[in-house]
Amino acid sequence: MTNNTKTITLNLGPQHPATHGVLRLILEMDGEVVNNAVPHIGLLHRGTEKLIEHKTYLQAIPYFDRLDYVSPMCQEHAFALAVESLLECEVPRRAQFIRVLFSELTRILNHTLNIGSQALDIGATTPLLWLFEEREKIMEFYEHVSGSRMHSNYFRPGGVAADLPEGLLEDIDKFIEQFPPKLHDIESLLNENRLWKQRLVDIGVASQKEAMDWGFSGPMLRGSGIAWDLRKSNPYDVYDEMDFKVPIGKNGDCYDRYFVRMLEMYESIKIIKQCIEKMPKGAVKTDDPKLTPPTRAKMKESMEAMIHHFKLYTEGYDVPAGETYKAVEAPKGEFGVYLYSQGGNRPYRCRIKAPGFAHLQGLDFMSKGHLMADVITIIATLDIVFGEIDR
């Protein structure tokens, strides 16, 4: 007997709403079962790394907001740390606490969108509506400190752009008091829901070895049972002073990755509480005049201060020759920046390591043998944003 099985090649995306951006997938299918899933990337490529080479170190910061535009402040954090490493400048403690505070708010901002949209992809509408209500509050905090809801451009090499407005810490404190009950409500809808578990448990399994081999990081790696978190293993700013746990999964399936993200939000709340309690007084920018512009009061009195301000924003500052790699534990995984300076006011090379790039490459092996509907679930738990993948 001859086997006359014929596979179907299906094009999914790039306009499909469930692909979370401009993902184009070429699926080779045997009926409803997926044999291969080949991602086609590059549809959102804007040449970010090359553009940064033609900008000063200060002008480069807004490009990082536009990579993973769901968690912008964490990307800025990595670039600021890399520039500070080359400059060997000291960041005031208040600025470090503010950075950590907003990095954790950003983590909640990211995970609420991921869990809400994941539920929507599977067919549950309510979690998205409830979580978007909470995201709106965090976006208002963004707006208070930076004037922008999304592309904040707030972190700076040497600190942050401006101090916290009066009353903001109290507002954030109120938010983290009322947020955990909302998370409990979401968990009561999803955790033991029969349909939710049928769609997530044992779907898209990545073993510990596979997760390591494919270069996974963040919730993708921790969901497979590996407790690797840069905030613990290689702490930056004041993370070494924070008391929090690293949630991990057991099976490495979609359900574990969902649950790790849910638990991470509770840990972020703990860190935010500690930041508010320990927040010191003081400056929010380094006192090095080469990096920090003069105050408005000085500019009204001194012509030299006006010239200094103008030159700082047009020509920037020179960074000593050298190279460095700095990474942060972004909500999606390890986001890294490799900087190479030749001693001028612009980076000679800026290489960006995006966690989503490695995660998307793992889609093929995680999808094999699953149904077409399961591919949508797996894409949702990868938590991909094409701003950072295509750059």
Swiss-Prot record:
Membrane topology: Peripheral membrane protein
Regions that span the bilayer: none
Descriptive protein name: NADH-quinone oxidoreductase subunit D
Stated family: Belongs to the complex I 49 kDa subunit family.
Catalyzed reactions: a quinone + NADH + 5 H(+)(in) = a quinol + NAD(+) + 4 H(+)(out)
Record GO terms (molecular function): NAD binding; NADH:ubiquinone reductase (non-electrogenic) activity; quinone binding
UniProt main location, coarse: membrane
Quaternary context: NDH-1 is composed of 14 different subunits. Subunits NuoB, C, D, E, F, and G constitute the peripheral sector of the complex.
PANTHER family the UniProt entry points to: NADH DEHYDROGENASE [UBIQUINONE] IRON-SULFUR PROTEIN 2, MITOCHONDRIAL (PTHR11993:SF10), NADH-UBIQUINONE OXIDOREDUCTASE 49 KDA SUBUNIT (PTHR11993)
Location in or out of the cell: Cell inner membrane
GO-annotated cellular components: plasma membrane
Enzyme Commission no: 7.1.1.-
This protein's UniProt keywords: Cell inner membrane, Cell membrane, Membrane, NAD, Quinone, Translocase, Transport, Ubiquinone
Entry function: NDH-1 shuttles electrons from NADH, via FMN and iron-sulfur (Fe-S) centers, to quinones in the respiratory chain. The immediate electron acceptor for the enzyme in this species is believed to be ubiquinone. Couples the redox reaction to proton translocation (for every two electrons transferred, four hydrogen ions are translocated across the cytoplasmic membrane), and thus conserves the redox energy in a proton gradient.
Recorded superkingdom: Bacteria
